């Protein structure tokens, strides 16, 4: 049926890092996992307007370190760092151990799959035509240096009676190439006709960790016979 494997899951440990990096014994593993989920749920709800792409959680020696990747660091930090201090206290209360919060700025939000998907979803909620929203997102990504991008929307597009899927792509998006740096994410748009799903794949180039790609040899041109002979 041509189903696609999750592009991030298949690349874990190859070109993609984990978003939770810690080690725990069997007795603590479930608690840590549940705690991570609670922290992410809380931060995503609290920072809904801050263009948060991902939240990375690390657990060094009886503490927790949370790195928030956002396109609007000023919104997260707040005036004189007040907001980030409140977040730190809330995270420490949720986990029960001392917390540290770091902010990482995303320089090019147009190349971040999560932010692109959320941008399209918010446009659909504002009744922007889905084709226009898709095309604009694709053109912005290609203009800023993406090697390829594909956007797919599914649901009652334009208020149609029957749900369908439509997609738009520019450049190449090689899903089977494991060394390809492909950023993938999804978002939901809650419209008056129902939920519309948005999927975004962004191809940023190939990760060549000391591996030299095999270059194709230029093909020799056939010799032309001189005229008149």
UniProtKB/Swiss-Prot annotation:
For this protein, the record's InterPro entries field holds: KH_dom, KH_dom-like_a/b, KH_dom_type_2, KH_sf_prok-type, Ribosomal_S3_C_sf, Ribosomal_uS3_bac-typ, Ribosomal_uS3_C, Ribosomal_uS3_CS
- Gene Ontology cellular-component terms listed: cytosolic small ribosomal subunit
A Gene Ontology molecular function term of the record: rRNA binding
Q: Where are the transmembrane segments?
A: none
Which Pfam family, any one, appears in the UniProt record?
A: Ribosomal_S3_C
CDD domains registered for this protein in UniProt: KH-II_30S_S3
* Function per UniProt: Binds the lower part of the 30S subunit head. Binds mRNA in the 70S ribosome, positioning it for translation.
Q: Which HAMAP family match?
A: Ribosomal_uS3_B (MF_01309_B)
Q: This protein's superkingdom?
A: Bacteria
Biological-process GO terms, alphabetical: translation
Keywords recorded for this protein, A-Z: Ribonucleoprotein, Ribosomal protein, RNA-binding, rRNA-binding
Entry annotated with the keyword ATP-binding? no
Record-annotated KH type-2 domain positions: 39-107
Protein's name according to its UniProt entry: Small ribosomal subunit protein uS3
Entry's family note: Belongs to the universal ribosomal protein uS3 family.
